[in-house]
Structure formats: structure tokens, C-alpha cells
Regions:
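Substrate-binding groove/exosite segments of carbohydrate-active enzymes
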Residues: 84-195
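Acidic/polar, glycine-enriched structural segments that form the non-catalytic walls/loops
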Residues: 1-135
Length: 195
């Protein structure tokens, strides 16, 4: 079975949101606003993804009360702390901008692919994608991702490895893939953990 992802979107500054065709929305803001040349306007919306349809209603209620300013402040603090840990590493590579830029891009990717525990995934781990057959944690990737996370997020690195050890077999092997529904866990290409 393929997991279905439900996207919950809430436009906080909108009065009305309508679908247009299969892939577009028309958003009518609560207040008319004449945008002057050279000026900008900010429209706030929240988007969250859930893997079970019944969770979508809970997510909608939760995102209605998000304190945006505090969320952005907390996120900036987390990002800056992680960035500082990585860029201040005692490495000759962190002295050259080309390598520093790559490190920042790697940090962005590691953060973007992180997923919290859900369903039969008991510890947070990274998904290469959240849709299709790759919507889960892959053992080969997990060990490498953990080795990157440990520089700025040691608890995330630990969680990445524990997600696979949750399914470790008696012979020491871990599944090649674990998913939201454990029926999809792939034992056919199992591997010894390289943690």
C-alpha cells in the first residue's frame, strides 16, 4: 500500500480560498489592499503534511493558533546555532567560502528532509521525499545523514540511527527501508548497520 499524504493549508490573512482547476488556488484577502509601486505586501499561510487523513483536522486546528513571530524567532535561533556549530568547526575547509557555501546547503537539505516520528516510525529520521515509494527512512542514507547531523544536531543524529535500530533483527541486520506503515518495511535488501 502507498501512503497518502494530506496537505493542510491555512491562509491566515484570507477571507476566502477557492480551488481553480486541479492545481491552483484563488485567494481573496480579508482586506482590500492597493499595492503601491516599489512596496510589498505579506500574506501569511501555514502548510503541514500528515500521513493519516484523520490527523488533518487536528493539524488544521493546531495551525490556526500558531504564533508566527515566535515560530520565526525560534527557527532563526535554531538555524543560527546549527550554522555556527558547523561553520566554526576546526577544519581547514571551513576557512574557504566555497566549502562554507556547500556546508550551508548541506545543512539546509538535512533540515528540510527531517521528519518527526509518525505511524510505525518511532524516532525522527530523514526522508529523501515525502511522496511515492521513497516516503520513509533508508538505512544506507540514515547512517550518512547521522554523520552530518552530529556536527550541529547530535540528538537528531542519535534519533536517525535509533529509527532503524527499532527494527533490528536478532541476526543484527536492519531493514533497507522503514515506512510509516511497517508492512512496507523492506527486508529483502537488509544490511548490517554501519552506525
Amino acid at each position: 500500500p502507498v501512503d497518502e499524504v494530506t496537505a493542510t493549508v491555512l491562509f491566515h490573512t484570507a477571507d476566502e480560498v477557492m480551488t481553480v482547476g486541479n492545481d491552483s488556488l484563488r485567494v481573496v484577502e480579508k482586506s482590500d489592499y492597493l499595492l503601491q509601486s516599489g512596496k510589498s505586501y505579506t500574506s501569511e499561510y501555514s502548510q503541514t503534511l500528515t500521513l493519516k487523513g484523520e490527523e488533518a483536522d487536528k493539524e488544521y486546528v493546531a495551525i490556526k493558533s500558531i504564533p508566527f513571530d515566535q515560530c520565526f524567532a525560534d527557527n532563526a535561533q535554531r538555524w543560527n546555532q546549527g550554522l555556527q556549530r558547523v561553520l566554526s568547526a576546526d577544519s581547514p575547509y571551513m576557512k574557504e567560502n566555497a566549502y562554507r557555501n556547500i556546508a550551508v546547503k548541506a545543512l539546509m537539505t538535512l533540515n528540510s528532509n527531517w521528519r518527526t516520528p509518525a505511524g510505525d516510525i518511532f524516532h525522527g529520521c530523514s526522508f529523501p521525499s515525502y511522496i511515492g515509494f521513497i516516503g520513509g527512512c533508508w538505512s544506507w542514507d540514515a547512517w550518512q545523514i547521522a554523520s552530518g547531523n552530529v556536527y550541529y544536531n547530535p540528538e537528531g543524529a542519535k534519533s536517525e540511527m535509533l529509527s532503524l535500530f527499532d527494527y533490528q533483527a536478532e541476526n543484527g541486520m536492519v531493514p533497507d527501508f522503514i515506512g510509516y506503515n511497517k508492512v512496507r518495511n523492506n527486508w529483502r535488501d537488509s544490511k548490517p548497520p554501519i552506525a
